[in-house]
Amino acid sequence: MATTRNFPTCGALARAALAVAIAAVLVFGAASPHGPSRPSWTAGLDADELDLIGFAGRMPDSEKPKLTAYFLRESYPRGGSARLVITDTATDVSVQFFRAGGEREETIPNDVMLGSAASTPQPIGDVTGRRELSLRLGNWPSGMYYARLTAGDRTGYAPFILRPHFLGEHRIALVLPTESWQAYNFRDDNRDGRPNTWYAGGNTARLIRPFTNRGVPPHWRQYDAPFVRWLVQTGRNVDYLSDQDLRTAGSGARLAAAYSLLIFSGHHEYVTKHEYDVVTGFRNRGGDLMFLSANNFFWKITIRDDVMTKVAQWRHLGRPEAALVGVGYRGNDRGKHRGPWIVRDIHSAPWLFAGMHLGLGGSFGSAGIEIDKTTPSSPRQLRILAEVPNLLGPGLSGQMTYYETPAGARVFAAGAFTLAGAVWSDDIEPLMANLWRHMAPDEPATA
């Protein structure tokens, strides 16, 4: 039986350097004379799929005492109610809400979420097997939030996005990759020894379920947490949206009426047709796009009854992602090689490198893991501003690009992992600040 809890809000939410540690490889077992052994669920996967499993980082699940819980939606409105499911047995459980990004320090472990308290701890008593709660949310700022559950030495996290009351409370929206998070969730839901994701075979993954590592989204600390913290700590106020909110956005025209800029900071690999349509329509109506990682809008998925089905690569369906993003996915070496971006064009976007004392051939940052590159489908007016040359071999370069459309849209793409994850580094933060000033001039930082 569901119960409702009201959480009193705390006072004002609180308002620096990150070393990005990324690649975690899949452990296939003890070595043998014929190479490492592999679990049975990898049978039938091709080499590229196995490489992607390695990238996805099927990190061993946390061995710390945990509580398992999840919300029944990817996002909830400010001031509404959220339904939390707890699937463990525990005594004297307490729940407290936090806003991610309010923390002053970087997140280090893969099984921890940090933030500033949005409510006080509330005891909910004992839990046996499964319990569903209806929890009242405060009228907090839109953002990335999580419920932290504790019972003695046990801790669990249940993340969700707190969306605005209506689209366009701010003119900029950050879209977090909730579908990709679940695609890379190696949780064994039915306990048959096989992770329930298409990276372990098959073509489906559940969208509403707990994450491994005590409930923390995959690669949260590397790809997403640094950028969310940067936005919050520097007073860059935006609407936070989930993929669910794009799926229900209605049309590109509606998005364009609400927002001037959509930011895709993370690994936005999987999208539905409707998501692809509304973002393309947004761009076609002059909406600006910012892609701060790589391998975006690559796979088509369908969703039915909260189950995602992987269909095909968009480029094989006549809709190459490069026509929208500017660049298309080219390769992944699981982080074996890294290199700096090298400046290739100052004149097409002098604003991007302003104050950084960089000329042609100058270098900044450290990129790798996955890379994007221009293709014949890239817009003709596109300019390559910088690249990570020959990272995966001759001609296999990650390319940072920018283009503008006749309708006035401006589209920036990083071309490699990851500007968002490195935003606190000394040579990336100035570039990100320049990019923000150019593409979000009406939303200055307030901190």
Residue ranges and their predicted role:
Residues 16-27:
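Bacterial N-terminal signal peptides
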Residues 25-38:
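C-terminal region of N-terminal signal peptides and the immediate post-cleavage residues
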Residues 37-66:
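Proline/serine/threonine-rich low-complexity linkers at boundaries of modular beta-sandwich domains
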Residues 68-91, 97-103, 110-162:
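Ligand-binding face of N-terminal immunoglobulin V-set domains in extracellular IgSF glycoproteins
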Residues 87-101, 152-255:
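Aromatic-Pro/Gly-enriched surface loop or interdomain linker
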Residues 121-127, 133-136, 216-304, 423:
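Helical hinge/lid and interdomain linker segments adjacent to catalytic or ligand-binding clefts
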Residues 233, 371-446:
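Extracellular low-complexity, Gly/Ser/Thr-rich intrinsically disordered linkers
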Residues 295-395:
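An acidic, glycine-rich "communication" segment
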